[in-house]
Regions:
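Cys/His-rich metal-chelating microdomains
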Residues: 52
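Canonical alpha-helical transmembrane segments
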Residues: 59-70
Length: 236
């Protein structure tokens, strides 16, 4: 580590991984909230809501890929593309309701803003954050291979979080694919869908705990099958 570098190589990778873990957790929280809103409160998503949820899933794929296979610029680029699609969808929904005088908006409001407004804010922050991380070259230059490459001290925790996150993304994709069939059929989805089944919070919490338990088991066996090669990074 040179005198001008504040962080060592391992510290740099640790900070980069923690940033991606935090981003993945935040996006999973948003997606979990959307599932709870759909099944717990019976609020079926509108067509633009489905676009935003799908884009949020794509946005979360970037951090997951960084954690699994190492820090790569193309992973951030994938998240930026997903955020641009989601931002366009949420901006379109905002303008639709703003253009109609007296329109109360679609769905519940949180802290004075509807969910599509919060989605737009999330996508804007994601684009700005990915742009800043793209300008941070050191994690790209260190040859990081991710949790599926070489061993590091927090690999087990990172592997568990990533697998748990990917399972959540898979569940959300399945929910989108299955729910649009009875809701939309083979045509366009209704702009203002009727209320759906209200299953309560118990089902949502059971799903979260079940996914966490399965992810922990998978992460344990993956960890056992991985080699014992210690992590090495390129010298600065």
């Amino acid at each position: 580590m040179s005198d001008t570098q504040l962080l060592s190589d391992k510290q740099t990778l640790t900070v980069a991984r923690l940033i991606n873990i935090a981003a993945l957790f935040a996006l999973l929280g948003v997606l979990a909230g959307s599932l709870n809103l759909q099944f717990g409160a019976g609020e079926l998503p509108c067509p633009l809501c489905l676009v935003q949820r799908s884009a949020m899933i794509g946005l979360a794929v970037g951090p997951a890929m960084n954690l699994l296979w190492g820090m790569k610029a193309r992973h951030y680029a994938l998240s930026i593309l997903a955020a641009l699609v989601g931002g366009a969808g949420s901006a379109r929904q905002i303008l639709l309701h703003v253009a109609t005088p007296g329109d109360p908006g679609f769905g519940p409001a949180i802290l004075g803003f509807h969910l599509y407004t919060w989605a737009f804010i999330t996508f804007v922050i994601a684009v700005a954050g990915c742009a800043v991380l793209l300008m941070w070259n050191r994690p790209f230059d260190l040859g990081d291979t991710g949790v599926l490459g070489k061993r590091h001290w927090h690999r087990s925790l990172t592997l568990f979080i990533t697998i748990w996150g990917l399972m959540w993304l898979l569940v959300d994709l399945l929910v989108i694919g299955i729910s649009v069939i009875p809701q939309c059929g083979l045509g366009l989805c209704p702009d203002d869908p009727p209320p759906g089944a209200d299953l309560g919070d118990v089902v949502g919490w059971a799903l979260v705990l079940g996914l966490g338990a399965v992810a922990a088991v998978i992460a344990y066996f993956v960890e056992r099958r991985m080699g014992d090669t210690p992590e090495r990074v390129n010298a600065s």
